[in-house]
A protein has these predicted regions:
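Active-site bordering "gate/hinge" segments
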Residues: 1-90
Length: 90
């Protein structure tokens, strides 16, 4: 892995998000950010944070939208609950 990716991950975790031990962190990952996500996960582990990684892609979203035949929930409670219980969202 490029050392610059590790450095960027450290900046995100330490400076941008100011992650501390015990923080609950949601890391939203896309297909082009794999290396950065791995580096951020390592940084979070070093700091003793709790990680939940989510994955999204255009292909995944399209598959769901094409298959879904009903109305969408305008305010999905499960998403709100996740965010309310999260200390840091990256």
């Amino acid at each position: 892995m490029d050392e610059r990716v590790r450095e960027h991950a450290a900046v995100l975790v330490d400076w941008s998000a100011r992650v501390e031990a015990g923080d609950d962190v949601v890391l939203s990952v896309g297909p082009d950010a794999h290396d950065l996500a791995v580096a951020v996960a390592a940084e979070l582990g070093d700091r003793g944070a709790n990680l939940l990684a989510t994955y999204g892609s255009g292909e995944l979203t399209r598959a769901y939208l094409r298959a879904h035949d009903g109305d969408f929930d305008e305010d999905p409670a499960h998403e709100l609950a996740l965010l309310e219980e999260t200390d840091v969202y990256l």
